[in-house]
Amino acid sequence: MCIRDSRLAGGIDPFSAGNALREIVPAIKALWRGDYTGEGEHWSFPKTTSSPKPQQTPNPPIWIAARDQNSHDFAVKEGCNVQVTPLWLGDEEVSSLMEKFDIACKNYSDIERPKIMVLRHTFVAETEEEILQGAKDISRFYCYFGAWFKNERPIEQGLIEKLTDEEMAGLEMYSPENMRKNSVIGSPEEVIARIKFCEDLGYDEYSYWIDSSMDFETKKKSLELFIEKVMPAFN
């Protein structure tokens, strides 16, 4: 997020953040090999190395979050695994992200195909009432996610100014109905089918996005149902 980049780098726009990533990934690999001097636009440091050295050959796996085609291309070119998320969007976006990854693999066919992981908001419940409440909670999460990302509302003591019910109701793309449709929310059987869809597209790993506006016990129950009734459907 731009807020995080600004905080960590003392003010940096998303485009510059992408360039900084493209510079630091090769540098990290070189540091693992040892005696590397950083002389880049964003990173500069004298000859140094990592200690101890990693045991993996040629280096530990690196995961890069990607959305646009350039990010997929860069990750595959560098031999890095890719993590994608449709955010509040649905299966169409999940398919589109895999298409970008496949294009990147074709563009760099000389590189061994890396792994790809999809991160999706996931909620498992046993009753329709619980499922609908889960959709409402994830809707609320994204309303605040969008507000933080826009970086326009006042912040006091680390908390953003509360959104009104009217403001959240006006954010149709984050509506509970859309979250119920787009996010992986439902009974164990429904969730299995949604994850099978991702598996059939070619995703290697599925990441359960548990962060939401739900309370701890609700999250715990969902995760327990996922472990007990969803995971056995997969190897």
Give the predicted meaning of each segment:
Residues 62-65, 80-85, 114-121, 206-208:
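Hydrophobic faces of well-ordered beta-strands that scaffold small-molecule active sites
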Residues 1-3:
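Conserved small/polar residues in nucleotide/adenosyl-binding loops
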Residues 15-50, 92-203:
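An alpha-helical appendage that flanks or caps ligand/catalytic pockets
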Residues 68-89:
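A conserved active-site cap/scaffold subdomain adjacent to cofactor or substrate pockets
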Residues 86-91, 153, 207-222:
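Glycine-rich, proline-tolerant flexible connector loops at the mouths of alpha/beta enzymes
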Residues 8-15, 220:
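Glycine-rich tight-turn/loop motif centered on a GG-T
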Residues 57-60, 225:
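N-terminal beta1-alpha1-beta2 module of alpha/beta enzyme domains
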Residues 20-24, 223-235:
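Alpha-helix-loop-beta-strand connector modules within alpha/beta enzyme cores
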